[in-house]
Amino acid sequence: MRLIVMGDLHYHDTDAAIAGWTEARDRFYETMIGKFLEEEGDFHISLGDLTNYGTATELAGVYGLLGQASRTFVHALGNHDLYAQKRADVLAITGQKRYHSIDTERATLVFLDTAKEQDFEDWGGWVDEEQLRWLEGVVQASGAKPMLVFAHHPVYRTTKRSEMDKGSIHHSIDMWSVLGQKQGVGVYFNGHTHVDSIHRERNWTFVQLSAVLDQHAVRLVDVESDCIRIAAKDVEEAGVLESAPTLYAHMPHFRHNPEARGGAEDRECVVSLTAATQA
């Protein structure tokens, strides 16, 4: 099974009065999303902040691009996706579920909603008690089958910057009380902090993707019989490289991070399933 995963995309509205901005926006995202969809996979996954403010026009624009190929696309909500509209309205437009799981032959896939609704002061993550108890049931039911979790916010004090204020699911929420019940291997994918990072703790591997605007790349996740292989694939087309500086200069609610790219150890890894089975 192969999964294609991308970090924060921040597809955004533009001001037509600013020369070249709309054209650069269209060229960047048409190229980037085209390369994302070009990759063959069983699921194509966004880790949230698919849009920059969650307006109806942003959602229509990005989903229009995503709909140009026949792919199974799953969108985990990010805080930026819920600024302009309420959660229910966003989900009505996208047709996505708030949180859910998919049980496959190779692994259990879990998609969380860690975003607060229209909270302009606190962009940190939150998981309510109902969702936490639901997740606990999914973890328990998965047994020793590998579990891959996809969420926007990291778990507190795991990947880089997850210890910062508003940089993770709130520290008062004991995610380990649920994740710690997992038998076998778990892999947790997230975005939000705009920096590449991989952290291993207990039987979990935490894989954090930087924003697509900063590091023009996706992750290829292959779930095999004996391991999970996570590889980075850069997008180096001119439509992306030449357009990005214009977006940095004009788009609101986003600050370019020139230090987003990590080393190889922050972007790629292999998670053994054999060792977990033997243990």
What feature does the model see in each segment?
Residues 56-136, 141, 174-177, 181-184, ...:
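Extended active-site neighborhood of metal-dependent phosphoesterases/phosphodiesterases
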